[in-house]
């Protein structure tokens, strides 16, 4: 799986899956790209593309959808190696998402 994140200033950060024998510690391509960009000071994004050798367009996992929502990435482009493409919003991928507005300030 590969991902590319377009920042508001036009810079692009790429990501790949980082596998681990303990599957829970594996990091997906989408989050790798997002975390690389954030670690370099970017917090505003235009779009994220994700592609894999899958039957249909590669859909992000739930954890990636949550992170995309946290960073307000408006456009998600999902594809595969055959050229199938779906373009959706993060909101469409994660309706009724949990966000910082759901955290009660104590």
Give the label of every model feature segment.
Residues 1, 102-103:
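Unusually extended, aromatic-enriched hydrophobic runs near protein termini
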Residues 1-7:
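Short beta-strand scaffold segments in enzyme catalytic cores
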Residues 106:
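Phosphate/diphosphate-binding glycine-rich loops and adjacent basic-rich segments that engage nucleotide
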Residues 14-102:
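Zn2+-dependent cytidine deaminase-like catalytic core
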């Amino acid at each position: 799986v590969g991902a590319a994140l377009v920042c508001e200033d036009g810079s692009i950060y790429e990501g790949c899956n980082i596998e681990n024998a303990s599957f829970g510690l594996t990091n997906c391509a989408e989050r790798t790209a997002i975390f690389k960009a954030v670690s370099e000071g970017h917090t505003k994004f235009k779009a994220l593309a994700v592609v894999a050798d899958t039957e249909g367009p590669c859909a992000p996992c739930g954890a990636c959808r949550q992170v995309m929502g946290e960073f307000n990435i408006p456009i998600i482009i999902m594809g595969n190696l055959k050229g199938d493409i779906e373009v959706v919003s993060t909101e469409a991928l994660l309706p009724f998402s949990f966000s910082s507005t759901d955290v009660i300030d104590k």
